[in-house]
Amino acid sequence: MLRESAVVISYENGIAKVKCQSQSACGQCAAKNSCGTSSLSELNGKRGEHIFNVETLMPLREGQIVEIGLEEKSMLLSALLMYVVPLLTLLIVTMLSDYISDNEILRAILIFGLTALSFILVKSYSRKLGQQTEFQPVLLRVLS
């Protein structure tokens, strides 16, 4: 199970709204002061904040730090959907477009259009998956 600490923003009727910050391994090692990659990553500004609703029977207070978890299977399937499906669509459509038309502009439009469509379909499917309980984070423990 993937674990992450989060801060409780609000709690109402068994639903805690928690906020966690996305972490990056870059900038955490001993060589971060002399590393160009770490310097470049600082130019991006703040890391993203993510807000989740977590069901819990334990009453929580605003500001408490909790640990939430997500099954690895959920994360792997999400990554597979987001990265592999559009990439495979791009590669397959590129190969098949050779047989469909000799006009390169038409082929480029077909390739980009179907790849964009695959991103849209993945996004809508991932929203449906996000509603399922195995894709929802769970409260593991209260840290403070």
From Swiss-Prot:
Gene Ontology CC terms: oxidoreductase complex; plasma membrane
Cell location: Cell inner membrane
Keywords recorded for this protein, A-Z: Cell inner membrane, Cell membrane, Membrane, Transmembrane, Transmembrane helix
Residue intervals passing through the bilayer: 76-96, 105-125
Topology with respect to the bilayer: Multi-pass membrane protein
InterPro entries, per the entry: RseC, SigmaE_reg_RseC_MucC
Source superkingdom: Bacteria
Family from the record: Belongs to the RseC family.
Name by which UniProt lists this protein: Uncharacterized protein HI_0850
Phylogenetic placement of the source organism: Bacteria, Pseudomonadati, Pseudomonadota, Gammaproteobacteria, Pasteurellales
